[in-house]
Amino acid sequence: MQHADALYLFNEGRNNQAYRLLGAHADISGTTFRVWAPNASRVSVVGDFNGWHGDVHQLHPLGESGVWEIAVAEAHTGNLYRFEITNRHTGDKLIKSDPYGRGFELRPGSAAYVVPPSMHVWGDADWLQQRAGWDWQQAPVNIYEVHPGSWMRHPDGKPYLWGELAERLIPYALAQGYTHLELLPITEHPLDESWGYQTTGYFAPTSRYGSADELRAFVDACHQAGLGVLLDWVPGHFPQDDWALARFDGTALYEHEDPRLGLHADWGTHIFNYGRHEVRSFLMSSAHWWLSEFHFDGLRVDAVASMLYLDYSRKHGEWLPNKFGGRENLEAIDFLKQLNAMVHGDFPGALTIAEESTAWPMVSRPTYVGGLGFSMKWNMGWMNDSLRYFHRDPIYRRWHHSELTFGQIYAYSENYVLPFSHDEVVHGKGSLLGKMPGDTWQRYANLRLLLAWQVLTPGKKLMFMGCEFGQQGEWSEGRELDWGSLANPENAAAQRLSADLNRLYRDLPALHTQDFSALGFEWIDCNDSEHSVLSWLRWGKDGSFVVVVFNFTPVPQPAYRLGVPEAGTYVELLNTDSAFYGGSNLGNGGALTATKGEWMGRPANLEVTIPPLGAVVLRRE
């Protein structure tokens, strides 16, 4: 693409590869710098190649585009640099990092450096070809959510680099039965405590874990091992650091001038101005960059609800309505549709997943039928109802039975992911294990039940690291997971159960081929609130089925009669109360016989022993 065409599309909000134009581009003759600063009277590049003096290398404007350019023979790969921008209205001089910078010095430093062209040779062509033809809606999608800096660390507390992480994380995730990793934001960010959600480098992998090529090698290794990698991406807001995007050229360039439109009071961050064409090109190009240059398999888009509503977390008088008088952010809606159309069009098989917590309709429906175009949406309602129910003492659960059954009313209105994410194990909420009631045995039994509840309920899955083995304390970004707890038999048993549940979900068509269809789920009995028992069938597209039975109290239910579709032998595929998983080992001897005879409106019936705080999965032989 010629520069004139690239500039035109950039100003039109339709340049999805603006990273080829803007930023720092090195070659044998030096480095060319370009930056968008339409309200500047002067722009200089300052760096360690010119003593950080603004008078040495002044950029020249490229017509009326607002973009400035200079070729600097003295600047080469590895050189640090910033932009010195003089506002045309006030004369104020601002020292800014490069919005399109591809690498930054390690915090607390914030200067960008000139990044060399990638030398990584990709070996994942087979993976990408397979992904392009992947019918993900009928496939098992089981996501392990990971904060790379705190999953596991060196004994001295230093985080692993990408290569070291690959050696440990990839085999672990595969052994646990996950299909994808989802990395909390690894875009550059100054504050560890933000977990990456306050991004300052939308085109730069954080320097905490190594170079850009080391990240490429990590993703490549995942793909060659059969593991997908999703990126948590944050287009909803950005931090107020004065050296970054905020008031970039002395004006509200990437954000809105009016705080009623441009400020997130909850997070102390700025909201992008999605109606500004160049901001649209910036964000679209960021998404394209990660999927193209790093081969990520999709994006989990953070805080979508905050983007959709102009009155999000605002009181009356603290927000401005749209041109129709409504509270919908029309520009953000249009941006999200454009984003999803680009991802699905340019990267076949790549996923987009919305963290969206409201009842906004058709989030995961195609744009051509009026939807936002996401592949999937987190089911926050299911997650909240489930955790609320499991937190209750079993003696009271009979009066809250609907907290578990209500989700099926809307379960197929979207393509849902069932998440137990990082947000549920921080800020005083306790760990998943810590939310469970009862004595030690009951707490672990409830945790096993919760793990099974997620996997056996229709929907794709997401589990935050550490939850799979019942970490006792809250997660902290400042330390590694409590791997030492696996010396505790209960934690090791929970880890085994999690792996077996994941493999069951992966291997049984009945548990994944109709995750998004009401045809894949059928209640056997959802009304036994007196005993806090639920039972259902999961159906595969191939006609296969499994019987699922849950007992949410510590009282065993022997000889519990259920109606089933067919007479014959039913094998007990999984029992969360097995001694292998730390349970009391109450079960069904491995198999049951269903006899002909109508029960619950079905032609056959069987009597199953449902263990205390246990779940059983049965399959007709």
Swiss-Prot record:
Enzyme class, first EC level, given as a word: transferase
SMART domains, A to Z: Aamy
Reaction(s) this enzyme catalyzes, per UniProt: Transfers a segment of a (1->4)-alpha-D-glucan chain to a primary hydroxy group in a similar glucan chain
Protein name: 1,4-alpha-glucan branching enzyme GlgB
GO cellular-component term (any): cytosol
Organism ancestry: Bacteria, Pseudomonadati, Pseudomonadota, Betaproteobacteria, Rhodocyclales
Subunit structure, interactors included: Monomer.
Domain of life: Bacteria
Keyword Transferase: yes
HAMAP family reported in the protein's UniProt record: GlgB
Gene Ontology terms: biological process: glycogen biosynthetic process
Family designation: Belongs to the glycosyl hydrolase 13 family. GlgB subfamily.
Taxonomic source organism: Dechloromonas aromatica (strain RCB)
Catalytic residues (UniProt): 302, 355
Keyword terms, alphabetized: Carbohydrate metabolism, Glycogen biosynthesis, Glycogen metabolism, Glycosyltransferase, Transferase
Annotated transmembrane regions: none
EC annotation from Swiss-Prot or TrEMBL: 2.4.1.18
Pathway listed: Glycan biosynthesis; glycogen biosynthesis
Gene: glgB
PANTHER family associated with the record: 1,4-ALPHA-GLUCAN-BRANCHING ENZYME (PTHR43651:SF3)
Stated role: Catalyzes the formation of the alpha-1,6-glucosidic linkages in glycogen by scission of a 1,4-alpha-linked oligosaccharide from growing alpha-1,4-glucan chains and the subsequent attachment of the oligosaccharide to the alpha-1,6 position.
Gene Ontology molecular functions: 1,4-alpha-glucan branching enzyme activity; cation binding; hydrolase activity, hydrolyzing O-glycosyl compounds
SUPFAM superfamilies: (Trans)glycosidases, E set domains, Glycosyl hydrolase domain
